Amino acid sequence: MAEPRTTRTSKSSSSTSKSASASKSASAAKASSSKSKSKSSKSDESKVHKLALKGSSKIVNEFFEYSINTILFQRGVYPAEDFTAVKKYGLTMMVTADDQVKAYIKKIMSQLKEWMYGGKITKLVVVITSKETGEHVERWQFDVQIFGKNSKTKSSKATTDQENSVPESSEVPEEKTEAEIQAEIQSVFRQITASVTFLPMLDGNCTFNVLVYADADSDVPLEWGDSDAKEIKNGEKVQLRSFSSSNHRVDTLVSYRLGD
């Protein structure tokens, strides 16, 4: 079961016999050679898979980093002057220039990279909370599916808790070009940007937290701790676009509190 985490601040007597022995030896050598080739082939396939998984994980990791920055900018959690423009995905993206926020996001991304490469992440959540009331007013959820994970590892625990369920997929993904993946990511960011048209304005000062749903057997640094799901009470939910790479699929969902 995946758990939400957040930062805290393995010798023959005859010629006939000799001939038979030689034949057997040649056969064994053949088998050994065949087995060796088979092992080598499997090893090569494993290396290719690991490289593909690493590359796919990097794509998802970068997407998360820019998602956090985009949400903070678009939702006005910090002043616009605290952000700077950069080019990414063929778009102009806004990233924080505030040293404290940059350090916080960097710490999150450093650990997230390790968990992503290990295939331990099932969900990343950005929660916006009112400083005055402590109420969670907006929740951005990114569900991560790892293709083929379900067929390789089965969860030892079953759960009926939708929030903690592990999204898995045994589908074989279509091969996509880098341009196709980028186009899908562009669509997600355009939707996040356009969400200001239907999301209520955030009243007063707000802060944010990042929750990472990692497998229960994940190594957790001391500065990270268990967290509740920080759900929006009686909130509205809107499903946004998704994107997929060679090994991952990421779905986006935003929940928000309706104005009084």
Segments predicted by a language model, with ranges:
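Long protein-protein interaction modules used by eukaryotic assembly/scaffold proteins
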Residues: 2-96, 100-102, 115-260
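Eukaryotic beta-rich interaction modules
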Residues: 103-110
